[in-house]
Amino acid sequence: MTQVTIGENEGIESALRRFKRQVSKAGILRDLRNHRHFETNLEKRKRKAVAVRRNRRKSMA
């Protein structure tokens, strides 16, 4: 869990920026998007296979 303590002379904007940075580094939003809907094992395999194909195509170009 990400926590940010605000210092005495620190503004809310800078604390919010630090919080957003910590959330993005921890990958919380990406994880939330991935778990938004249930995904069966078959769907996971298909998604990963498509990603592999896409990466191969990018590396060839």
UniProtKB/Swiss-Prot annotation:
One of its GO terms (molecular function) is structural constituent of ribosome. Keywords: Ribonucleoprotein, Ribosomal protein. The keyword Lipoprotein does not apply. PROSITE patterns: RIBOSOMAL_S21. InterPro entries: Ribosomal_bS21, Ribosomal_bS21_CS, Ribosomal_bS21_sf. One of its GO terms (biological process) is translation. GO terms for cellular component: ribonucleoprotein complex; ribosome. It comes from the Bacteria. Belongs to the bacterial ribosomal protein bS21 family. This is Small ribosomal subunit protein bS21.
